[in-house]
Amino acid sequence: MLKKVSQHFWKKENQIGRINKMSSDELIKQTLESAKTIAMVGVSLVKKEISTNIRRRPSTIVMKYLQEFGYKVIPVNPFSVGEKVHGETIVGKLNDIKIPIDIVDVFRPSKEAPMIAEESVKIGAKVFWLQYGIQSDEAKKIVESKKIFYVSNKCIKQEYQRLFLKVSPVFPALKSS
């Protein structure tokens, strides 16, 4: 199905002569419906201020949420190799994953996105997803040149909630009264 999504997009893109992946709800929904395995780059076990509460990290919150909806999420962090988070063992890099990856979801700074994009191409990922606040024109060029679906500056958890559960993507703690 992900191959179908990618083919559909490229056919449509050639018809209209431009790329507009970042705002396509239909393509994002099809992607989330068909994906089974997500590599989450940048899963952190502890906050920088040395907190021991791993559940408060955005990456671990999103990881747990996706697991609850049936996705296999493989955490990637070169500084925490071998440690466990939400029942999964952290690997050091994308190349360490031995199963096919549908989505590479990135929780790293924008400047690291091109390198992660190159690794995503090498492992044959179908989708390259940059979380809120992360954008990279260079990474976009890398993945799109290989016909990999590119999403940036969107939270995969909030997109799932919005498109499937019709839930407001605003965190309850941030809602005004």
List each language-model region with its residue ranges.
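Structural/interface elements that position substrates and couple domains in central-metabolism enzymes
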Residues: 2-10, 15-102, 110-177
